[in-house]
């Protein structure tokens, strides 16, 4: 059973990281579009929001893949995702927006699992903790 747990934890981290990496890289490719989208939501400082989103998504995605500071990274990504859901998918009269909102909330739930239980044994965190003992 331990082999299955190990594989599931690593797979879950990789799948979650892929979501953030793809989103962050996509933002790099279309700065004007993303800044316009941020501005259209009525948020201040679209350029700053754009840069923060890239740092959080790409940086957080990479850190999730390698399993470094996973609990902290998961909490940051969870807060970021919750904020994005509230800012961008809050038009519940539109069924599509409601679906996006609840998908984001489900992602937050998955990230909270990483925050609570850590990255699993195939991670830099596990290696670092094993070396410390």
Where are these regions (language model features)?
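Extended, low-polarity transmembrane helix blocks
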Residues: 1-29, 39, 47-55, 59, ...
């Amino acid at each position: 059973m331990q082999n299955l747990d190990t594989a599931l934890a690593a797979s879950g981290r990789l799948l979650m990281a892929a979501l953030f990496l793809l989103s962050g890289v996509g933002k790099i490719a279309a700065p004007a579009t993303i800044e316009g989208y941020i501005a259209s939501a009525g948020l201040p400082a679209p350029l700053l929001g754009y840069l923060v989103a890239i740092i959080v998504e790409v940086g957080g995605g990479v850190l999730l893949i390698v399993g470094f500071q996973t609990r902290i990274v998961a909490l940051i990504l969870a807060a970021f995702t919750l904020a994005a859901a509230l800012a961008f998918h809050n038009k519940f009269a539109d069924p599509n927006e409601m679906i996006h909102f609840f998908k984001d909330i489900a992602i937050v739930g998955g990230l909270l699992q990483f925050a609570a239980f850590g990255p699993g044994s195939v991670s830099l965190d596990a290696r670092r903790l094993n070396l410390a003992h």
